[in-house]
């Protein structure tokens, strides 16, 4: 029997639920539900027969491909470490040391950290500012077009949308 979640086959997770073996590896909860961890009965590390997040070939690859179709991206990746790890990975994947990157002044500190670690040349631009409430709101397409025209050699542009205050920017990707 194979479960499906959004069209993705989950045969391996079904097999894990039926497995009557005690695991002597991480994670430490040993697939037990005693700790109230949702999904612990199928939580397993990269062992033979399981997929590997860093070299996906099975369920993880299927999920990444499905995400690519949903978001109409060339490639999608699952990640760990939260958004900070994802931001670092994305910037390192696109930019080499010394490259130019354009970032909005309201970006998360992990963007600044990534730029420092990668030794990037940073060009800043300012999203619209709400003087009444005292924070940056959204970025306009005209602002993006202008900063890109002035920095055609930039490898990437980082825009926070939605912002921490919930404002969104309607920016057309020029890929």
Regions found by a protein language model. Name each.
Residues 4-58:
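N-terminal "arm"/small-domain region of PLP-dependent enzymes with the aminotransferase-like
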Residues 103-122:
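Substrate-binding/gating loop at the entrance of the active-site cleft, primarily
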Residues 133-175:
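Active-site phosphate-binding strand-loop segment of PLP-dependent enzymes
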């Amino acid at each position: 029997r194979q479960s499906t979640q959004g069209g993705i086959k989950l045969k391996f997770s079904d097999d894990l639920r039926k497995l009557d073996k005690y695991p002597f590896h991480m994670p430490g909860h040993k697939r037990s539900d005693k700790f109230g961890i949702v999904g612990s009965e199928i939580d397993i590390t990269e062992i033979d027969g399981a997929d590997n997040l860093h070299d996906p070939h099975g369920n993880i690859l299927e999920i990444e491909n499905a995400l690519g179709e949903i978001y109409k991206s060339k490639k999608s990746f699952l990640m760990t470490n939260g958004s900070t790890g994802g931001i670092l990975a994305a910037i390192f994947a696109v930019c080499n040391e010394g490259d130019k990157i354009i970032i909005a002044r309201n970006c998360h500190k992990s963007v600044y950290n990534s730029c420092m670690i990668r030794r990037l040349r940073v060009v800043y631009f300012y999203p619209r500012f709400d003087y009444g409430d005292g924070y940056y709101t959204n970025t306009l397409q005209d602002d993006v077009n202008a900063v890109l025209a002035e920095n055609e050699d930039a490898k990437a542009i980082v825009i926070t949308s939605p912002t921490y205050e919930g404002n969104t920017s309607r920016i057309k990707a020029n890929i």
